[in-house]
């Protein structure tokens, strides 16, 4: 029971402490609020006193009328006039400040220009050009011309040196923007014309190239036809000529005696035909193969054959060649 009592006492003490703390905080906040109110009231009083002083000064500046009227309605009018006068004074002060600023700005500009001109004069000295102009004096009846020429010596060719003509020449040489635009238009037109001319030339060249290529093709075809015709005509012309085996040659005496040939000159193809006829007449073909020829004593002697040698249709020309070569060698020896 004692423990419960102590815990309840502690809780009561804690509650009382918290209530006291909250009361203290409230008193502090109320004091701070009252202090802030007092400070605000003091500030408002000071501002009001300052404004009243300003009004008094404006009354003295404005003249006698504003100083004599102190009624409630008159006080309003005085305030209005004082505000308008203050605005005028402020405007005048602003104008003075602006005028002083503009003067300073102009002075700075002039100082910069003078510094630039001095630097330019140091860097690049100005050359004054002088040009000679011959003036021919003409005697006119007018008094004005005489009066103008009284101060000029009329003896001989008078020479006057004029300065600063380059500027006039430059002004004359300067072209107006309209003239420049016209020149640009003319240049663009001339450029377009040249482009069109070049395109036309390219087209003409392309057409010419096509024509030339077609002519080349036609010539090539004609040449091929001529070659074909020449080959055909050459074959026809050379058909009567003899060459190789068809060429007539002197027949050896041994073959004449064997084949009973009366002509001295015959082609080798004709001689082979006579040889095959001789083989068939004498039944010299092999009955089994019918490709080999069984030679007799005369053929062996003619061709100079040995044991084991065979005559066929494939090696017939080699045996005949042997006979023709022996005949040619004998003729050379006789000569």
From Swiss-Prot:
Residues 83-109, 163-173 have a biased composition (Basic and acidic residues). Residues 1-182 are annotated as: Disordered. Residues 181-217 form a coiled coil. Residues 24-33 have a biased composition (Low complexity). Keywords: Coiled coil. Residues 1-12, 110-126 have a biased composition (Basic residues). Residues 60-75 have a biased composition (Polar residues). The lineage of its organism: Viruses, Varidnaviria, Bamfordvirae, Nucleocytoviricota, Megaviricetes. This is Putative SWIB domain-containing protein R508. Residues 244-326 form the SWIB/MDM2 domain. It comes from the Viruses. Disulfide bonds: none annotated.
């Amino acid at each position: 029971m004692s423990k419960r009592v102590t815990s309840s006492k502690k809780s009561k003490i804690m509650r009382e402490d918290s209530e006291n703390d909250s009361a203290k905080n409230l008193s502090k906040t109320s004091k701070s609020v009252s202090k802030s109110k007092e400070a605000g009231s003091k500030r408002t009083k000071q501002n009001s006193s300052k404004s009243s002083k300003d009004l008094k000064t404006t009354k003295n500046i404005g003249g006698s009328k504003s100083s004599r009227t102190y009624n409630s309605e008159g006080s309003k009018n005085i305030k209005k006039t004082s505000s308008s006068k203050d605005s005028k004074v402020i405007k005048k002060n602003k104008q003075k400040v602006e005028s002083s600023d503009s003067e300073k700005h102009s002075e700075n500009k002039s100082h910069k220009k003078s510094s630039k001109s001095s630097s330019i004069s140091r860097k690049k000295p100005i050359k004054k050009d002088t040009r000679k102009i011959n003036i021919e004096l003409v005697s006119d009846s007018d008094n004005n011309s005489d009066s103008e020429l009284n101060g000029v010596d009329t003896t001989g060719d008078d020479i006057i040196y004029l300065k600063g003509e380059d500027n006039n020449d430059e002004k004359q040489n300067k072209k107006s923007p309209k003239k420049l635009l016209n020149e640009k238009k003319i240049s663009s037109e001339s450029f377009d014309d040249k482009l069109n001319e070049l395109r036309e030339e390219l087209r003409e060249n392309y057409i010419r190239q096509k024509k030339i290529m077609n002519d080349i093709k036609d010539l090539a075809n004609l040449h091929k036809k001529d070659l074909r015709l020449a080959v055909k005509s050459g074959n026809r012309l050379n058909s009567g000529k003899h060459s190789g085996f068809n060429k007539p040659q002197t027949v050896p005496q041994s073959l004449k005696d064997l084949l009973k040939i009366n002509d001295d000159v015959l082609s080798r193809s004709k001689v082979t035909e006579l040889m095959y006829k001789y083989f068939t007449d004498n039944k010299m073909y092999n009955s089994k193969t019918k490709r080999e020829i069984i030679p007799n004593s005369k053929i062996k002697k003619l061709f100079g054959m040995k044991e084991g040698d065979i005559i066929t249709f494939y090696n017939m020309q080699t045996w005949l060649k042997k006979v023709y070569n022996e005949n040619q060698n004998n003729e050379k020896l006789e000569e």
